[in-house]
Amino acid sequence: MEKMLECAFIVLWLQLGWLSGEDQVTQSPEALRLQEGESSSLNCSYTVSGLRGLFWYRQDPGKGPEFLFTLYSAGEEKEKERLKATLTKKESFLHITAPKPEDSATYLCAVQ
């Protein structure tokens, strides 16, 4: 019997520093349900003047956010276990390869 794995991804963005009228960060999808072992990606699109860094966090229920990655320039990639983060000029992706039940959490992106 296949186990259903629910990974909650919430549309939440954190803007560190001053927010101008044109700065925006959008995370999608809002929620994602995966079967164990089924890979997928989260998208974090941004329009920010003078990006100094993009951050990915993971938050388990009832706990504070846990830092995963910081990306500074387009083309940069970082990997940790089943997670891989990539950055382009306008968006970042968090790829989850072969997720397990313990990967169920809220994943957040933030820009500075």
UniProtKB/Swiss-Prot annotation:
Q: Which UniProt keywords apply?
A: Adaptive immunity, Cell membrane, Disulfide bond, Glycoprotein, Immunity, Immunoglobulin domain, Membrane, Receptor, Signal, T cell receptor
Q: Which residues are glycosylated?
A: N43
- Give disulfide pairs as residue numbers: C44-C109
**Chief location of this protein within or outside the cell:** membrane
- Please report the stretch or stretches of sequence annotated as the Ig-like domain: 23-112
Q: Name one GO cellular component term.
A: T cell receptor complex
Q: Where in the cell is it found?
A: Cell membrane
Q: Note the superkingdom of the native organism.
A: Eukaryota
The record ties this protein, via Gene3D superfamilies, to: Immunoglobulins (2.60.40.10)
Do you know which CDD domains this protein is assigned to?
IgV_TCR_alpha (cd04983)
Signal sequence annotation: 1-21
Q: Which terms under GO biological process does the entry name? A: adaptive immune response; response to bacterium
Query: How does the record describe its quaternary structure?
Result: Alpha-beta TR is a heterodimer composed of an alpha and beta chain; disulfide-linked. The alpha-beta TR is associated with the transmembrane signaling CD3 coreceptor proteins to form the TR-CD3 (TcR or TCR). The assembly of alpha-beta TR heterodimers with CD3 occurs in the endoplasmic reticulum where a single alpha-beta TR heterodimer associates with one CD3D-CD3E heterodimer, one CD3G-CD3E heterodimer and one CD247 homodimer forming a stable octameric structure. CD3D-CD3E and CD3G-CD3E heterodimers preferentially associate with TR alpha and TR beta chains, respectively.
Q: What does this protein do?
A: V region of the variable domain of T cell receptor (TR) alpha chain that participates in the antigen recognition. Alpha-beta T cell receptors are antigen specific receptors which are essential to the immune response and are present on the cell surface of T lymphocytes. Recognize peptide-major histocompatibility (MH) (pMH) complexes that are displayed by antigen presenting cells (APC), a prerequisite for efficient T cell adaptive immunity against pathogens.
> What is the recorded name of this protein?
T cell receptor alpha variable 20
Annotated organism of origin: Homo sapiens
